Amino acid sequence: MTRNKVNRRDFIKLSAVGLAVAAGTRAISEARASEAVKGEHQWAMVIDQSKCTGCGYCTLACQAHNDINPDIEWNKVSNTGEVNGKMVYLARPCMQCEHAPCVEVCPVGASYYRDDGIVMMDYDKCIGCRYCEIACPYQARSFNWEAFDGANPAVPEWGTPEVERRPRGVPEKCAFCYQRIDRGLALGMKVGVDIEATPACCVACPTGARLFGDLNDPESNVSQLLRKHTSYRLRENLGASPRVYYLPVDEAVTEEG
């Protein structure tokens, strides 16, 4: 009897996972009507791979300002190979997709859109089902199996916490340092220009590889970069429309060193 019950429970869990994946795929392709009405600002990030050195400062600043467990990374940096003898790196925050499968599969509405395009998490509402984590095509979410009760090794060297720690048993993710954006706008600052109103990862980058701004503003730094340079987004064929753009490695730059 016990064995049959365990098998049935496992079957139900596996079925739920399958449904989450299927729903995520459907959400991307159909772009359903639950998307937020677009507001005055539409935030985006541009990452220049020609400038990224893989130093990891962005990850450390993110962990400090968002008070993240050192075993979890909201911003991941990986080595993707070489171009003309120069190492190429790929930095991956949450992509803040316009058609986010994580939002579509959440059964309790804990994942949701802000009108400025940021995909948010209501950690108090989250039930820890992990459907969003499974549905995300970018592996942007990390499930915290244990409560983070200790000291944060990234504090104070890389910044001080600006948000509360998440409860145990929820999938955590980057939210473009929304707290800095909101505070900056309230104080009349220019997001993406004024340091206090810009995501911590962008501020910490020593080479200026990460830029942030408003796609609705044609004069913003991101709008100008995207007009002047060739860019790409990860897995564009899925139709999720991520808000993180990459400037590919310029071979002329790598030849110059």
Language-model features: where?
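A generic secondary-structure signal for well-formed alpha-helical elements
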Residues: 15, 19-26, 66, 140, ...
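C-terminal segment of N-terminal export signals and the immediately downstream linker at the start
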Residues: 5, 25-56, 233-240, 245-246, ...
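Residues in well-ordered beta-strands of folded domains
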Residues: 78, 175, 245-247
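Cysteine-centered iron-sulfur cluster-binding motifs in ferredoxin-type domains/subunits
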Residues: 45-66, 86-110, 120-139, 164-204, ...
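Non-heme iron-sulfur electron-transfer modules
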Residues: 28-37, 64-92, 112-125, 139-170, ...
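Long, compositionally biased charged/polar accessory segments in the mid-to-C-terminal portions
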Residues: 179-257
